Amino acid sequence: DIADVITGKAKDFIIKHKDEPFFMYMGTQDVHVPRVPHARFAGKSGMGTRGDVILQLDWTVGEIMNTLDSLNLADNTIFVFCSDNGPVIDDGYQDQALELLNGHTPMKQYRGGKYSAYEAGTRIPFIVRWPAGIQPCKQQALFSMIDVYASLAALLNHPLTPATVAPASRDQLATFLGKDNTGCDYVVQQNLNNTLSIIQGTWKYIEPSDKPAVEHWTKMELGNDPKPQLYNISIDPSEKNNVAATHPEMVKELSTLLEQVKAGKNQGTK
């Protein structure tokens, strides 16, 4: 009954605060652990326990949306649905996740997955719904979860002072609202072993690392390599072709930028 309890508490919170502005963060265990689908969903997906809890998550989101609708709050409520990392299939649990995929490809064409520096590890779903302020659209802009903080502060005309408040968060409100399809000038990412990568424009650089290439439990490629890695993700989203050797000038540019970010000397212009 975990999902039912969490969903019930969320709905109660919304009802309690329906007459005033409110912020609610709701996390779910469904696509993490424990994966325990309610009897309403157990065996219904045809994809085992993992598929069943995804159905349960879908129900949970629907319950929250229905509550907002019933209170006439949906049009002027900002609703964000996102994840903290990319997918993992076999993470050590005996739930037949691999055997029952039935052709489903959680990573699509992207390399790696959860824990990884590659795109399937850091590229996540990010859905924003706000009928009163956002026209439906699909964005390919570069955007970081870290920037949600400063972007919402900008929406509220709330200055982030002192400068020590969320210093890495940048105002990306135009992108958040679907009005800018460019987004950040760069985004820094980190894998399980603290190996950093940086994306700027169409280029992605992963710093050299002597950490393990594969996570032993999940058999996931981590993106660690003793040599620098450079990918043009606009034409090579699967990160199959490391072009660091043929584009040394771009390796130098992005590695220098990454070192500046590490040293706190470059927070980006947007």
Task: Go through each PLM region and give its residues.
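C-terminal cap/loop subdomain of S1 sulfatases and analogous C-terminal strand-loop tails that border
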Residues: 89-117, 133-141, 145-229, 233, ...
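Beta-strand elements within well-structured catalytic alpha/beta cores of enzymes
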Residues: 21-27, 54, 61, 78-83, ...
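Histidine-centered active-site microenvironments of extracellular/periplasmic hydrolases
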Residues: 34-37, 43-47, 66, 70-133, ...
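Intrinsically disordered, low-complexity polar regions and short flexible loop motifs
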Residues: 236
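Active-site His/acidic residue clusters
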Residues: 10-53, 88-90, 94-97, 269
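Loop/turn elements at helix/coil->beta-strand transitions in domains of secreted/extracellular proteins
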Residues: 17-24, 73-79, 123-124, 181-185, ...
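A long, amphipathic alpha-helix that forms part
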Residues: 1, 5-14, 40-77, 101
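Short, solvent-exposed turn/loop segments enriched in Gly/Ser/Thr/Pro and often Arg
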Residues: 25-34, 81-89, 168, 187-193, ...
